[in-house]
Amino acid sequence: MKRILFISPTTSMDNGAEKSIYYLMKYLIQLGHTVINVTHAIGGEPQDKHEQLYKMIGVKNYYLPTVKWWWPDAPGGEILNREEATSYYRQNVQDIAEIIEQNEIDLVISNTVNVFQGAIAASCQKVPHFWLIHEFPKNEFAYYADKIDFIEEYSSELFSVTGELNNFLTPLFNKKVHSFISYTEQETKVLKKGNQVRIVSVGRLTEGKNQLELIKAYKTLNRLDIELVFIGGWDSKYKAICDEYI
C-alpha cells in the first residue's frame, strides 16, 4: 500500500476539482492506502469545517499560511508585495518537502495546474509526482500555456479530464497525457413539490463558466414568474461584473 500526498487548490468544496479529488481520496483509503492532504490556511470556521470533512474519511490535513496559494499570475487575487509572496512560496515548498520526508510519502499528486509547490517539493525529495489537470489553457487559465514545459518536466505522469480537454492537451505535451473521469458521490433524494419554477445554476461564479451569458439569456426570456438562482462561491471581480449587469 502507498502513502500518498495530495496538494489541494482550495480549502473548500465549492468546485468540481476539489469535490472529485475528495472522493478519489476516500476511494484510495478504502483500498488501504494512506492519504494526506496539503492546502492553504484560511482560518476560522470554514477551515474547521474543511478539516472535519476530511477527518470523516480518514485524511489528515496540513494547512500552510501563504500570501497566494496559486501561481503568481493565476486568477484568484493579486499579489501586492512580490517579495513577501516569494518568501511564502519558498516556505511552502520547504514545508511540503518536510511533510513528504516525515510521512514517508511514496507519491505526490497536485490537483489542478494552479498549484506547483508540491511538484518542486517532490522533485527535491526524489518522489514521483502526478499532475491532475482540470483546466483548458485559455481564458482565465491561459496563463499556464507558458508553463507547459515546467509542468511536463516536473511530472512523472500527467493526467487530464477525459474528453475534449485531453484531446486539446495531448498535442501540447511530449509526454503522454493520461485521462481520468472526475467522480462525485451523489445521494438520491426525492424532491419536494413547490409552487415556484426556478432555473438553478450550481457552481462557482467565474469567467470560465460564463454565467453572465446565462443572465443575459434569462433577460431575453422575459419571464418574471421564473427565478434564476446561483448556488456556490464566486470570484469577486466576475461577480461584480454580473452584479453590475443585473
Region locations from a protein language model:
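A conserved, positively charged/aromatic
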Residues: 129-156
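Conserved nucleotide-sugar phosphate-binding/catalytic loop shared by glycosyltransferases and other
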Residues: 39-78
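Donor nucleotide-sugar binding/catalytic pocket of nucleotide-sugar-dependent glycosyltransferases
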Residues: 62, 153-189
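Glycosyltransferase donor-sugar binding loop
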Residues: 38-46, 202, 227-243
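Short His-centered aromatic/hydrophobic patch
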Residues: 110-115, 133
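Short amphipathic alpha-helix
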Residues: 16-28, 46-50
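Short beta-strand->alpha-helix junction loop in the catalytic core
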Residues: 67, 137, 164-165, 180-189, ...
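A conserved mid-protein helix/loop that constitutes part of the nucleotide-sugar donor-binding site
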Residues: 15-23, 197, 206-220
